[in-house]
Amino acid sequence: MLIVGSFALTLIQFGLGVDVRQFIDYQIKQAGSNAPQLWLDRPEISFYVHRSLSLVVVVLSIWIYKLVIKEGLAQKYIQFIIGCILAEIALGILMYYVDFPWGTQPLHLLIAALLFSAQLYWLFRIKIKPYDLSI
């Protein structure tokens, strides 16, 4: 099921995000908290996978959205999910290219938690009232 696959990718993204965060914490200890331009100077592979996989998550979510529209199903869940994903990507871009502006890291984590919650809620709703979004 496509929605379960999307949820699984989100869980993988969480794990990769934790790795990236641990790397950033280490870089802060090494370079100092006043040198955010150095924190991702030489990122680990997990950063690149995390960044690239986010595009796969967007494409998969848009695909699910198109199937939801085609089937005439409730769109509010997938619209919220796509909104969270786009906000996550925008914050990721800000953190990387603008050297971690104030508040972007906690906001990135908060929206990730909202995304996880929305996807999990949608999965539970589907279990209660199943519908088919198979390929």
Predicted regions span which residues?
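Polytopic transmembrane helical bundles with strong interfacial aromatic enrichment
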Residues: M1-I135
